[in-house]
Amino acid sequence: HKSDGTKISEDSMTYEKNPYWYDADKVTVNKLQFMLSADDTAIYSAYNAGDVDFIDTVPTNEIASLKDVNPEFHIIDALGTYYAAFNCKSALFADKTPEQAACMREAFSILIDRDYIIENVAQCGQKPANSFIPYGMADGNGGIFKTDLVEQGYFDPFAINNDYEGTVEKARTLLKAAGYKFGDDGMLSAETPISLEYLTNEATSHVKIGEAMQQDLAAIGIDMTIKQCDWNVFLQERK
């Protein structure tokens, strides 16, 4: 299929059968129209209304019930890595050395309970990420690139589950190396507060993941606010 020549709008794009495709005679679908939206609730509503035939996302609060009763709901593997990116030029790192900023980012990362996010938010059997390279990538020699992850030197994504207190204490140690102080209760001192903003679009899954991270960081007194915006604003903010 190829573009039908019309301008792609903010909410849809249309493709038509390409007569120059080498096997065009076997193409039976003459036109494809795609709904463009970052709002999974709107996408799911359009599917239920019969406005679209296929969707690849649903609101997270619908997943559990769909698994049990809807034969049209399928979970399939896909290569990908969900990640949170830092703006290293933000005020958060303004007075820090590169080494101190790295300590801060590591502390934030190890405090995130990835297993909780998978079980309670994503709910589709994802694996916790411990590098940018996703699971399932070939190694070029007929094998899988990532196997015994921790033994290969990768970050242990289950550390926060297997040794919560030890992992939290490591996060405190990293933040102390970056100049932050803690009280006797293990919480950040009011002398050296940490506040940061988490930017996401309005999809329910992204917001809920942000809320889970917000709760994890609050465990030692880090204040993270969640800023929701539509997709176009989100892209501009990230530039």
Residue ranges and their predicted role:
Residues 127-178, 201-207:
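Structural transition elements
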Residues 7-11, 161-168, 178-239:
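Ligand/substrate-recognition segments at binding pockets and active sites
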Residues 43-44, 104-105, 234-238:
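Short, hydrophobic alpha-helical packing/hinge segments within bilobed ligand-binding/sensory domains
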Residues 20, 48, 52, 67-68, ...:
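Sec-exported extracytoplasmic/periplasmic mature domains
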Residues 16-22, 79-104, 111, 120:
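A bilobed periplasmic-binding-protein/Venus flytrap-type ligand-binding module shared by bacterial periplasmic
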Residues 33, 51, 91-98, 104-107, ...:
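Second-shell loop/turn segments in exported
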Residues 15-65, 214, 223-225, 230:
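Ligand-site clamp/hinge motif
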Residues 63-77:
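Ligand-binding "clamshell"
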